[in-house]
C-alpha cells in the first residue's frame, strides 16, 4: 500500500501524518486562528519528516484539503545487517526488503523481530519487538 488520500486540513490533529512539500510528516503542533470578522479560519501546522529529521511548517485555510499518506505498519524479521542497511523478511508475505539502518532504534540484530512501516514507497524501522 502506498500513496496518499485527501483529508480536511481543519480536522488534522497532533500525532497524525500529513504530506507537506512531498514529504511525509508527523504533526507536532497545530493552531487554529480566525483573523477577523470577514476572514476565514486559518490553520498553522508544525510537522517533522518521518524519514528525514526536517521540520516543516504549513499555513492554510481550515476548509482546504491536505494529502494524508497511507501508512502500512508491518512486522518483519531481521535477516542480516549490512553496513548502513538492514535486510528484513516480512512476516506475512515473506518478501525480503533492504531498509536503511535507523539511528534512533536500538537492539537491531540478526534474528530480531521488528516493526516497520511503508509510506509513499519508502520504509522505516520503528521499533524492535523481540529477539
From Swiss-Prot:
- InterPro entries recorded: IF5A-like, IF5A-like_N, NA-bd_OB-fold, Rib_uL2_dom2, Trans_elong_IF5A_hypusine_site, Transl_elong_IF5A_arc, Transl_elong_IF5A_C, Translation_prot_SH3-like_sf
> Which terms does the record give in the GO molecular function aspect?
ribosome binding; RNA binding; translation elongation factor activity; translation initiation factor activity
The entry's keywords: Cytoplasm, Hypusine, Initiation factor, Protein biosynthesis
Q: Can you say where in the cell this protein is located?
A: Cytoplasm
Record bears the keyword Cell wall biogenesis/degradation: no
Where, per the database record, does this protein carry Hypusine?
A: 37
What superkingdom heads the lineage? Archaea
Keyword Protein biosynthesis present in the record's keywords: the answer is yes
Name the PROSITE patterns for this protein: IF5A_HYPUSINE
Q: Which NCBIfam families match?
A: eIF_5A, PRK03999.1
Protein family (similarity comment): Belongs to the eIF-5A family.
Q: What does this protein do?
A: Functions by promoting the formation of the first peptide bond.
Q: What is this protein called?
A: Translation initiation factor 5A
Species: Methanococcus vannielii (strain ATCC 35089 / DSM 1224 / JCM 13029 / OCM 148 / SB)
Lineage runs: Archaea, Methanobacteriati, Methanobacteriota, Methanomada group, Methanococci
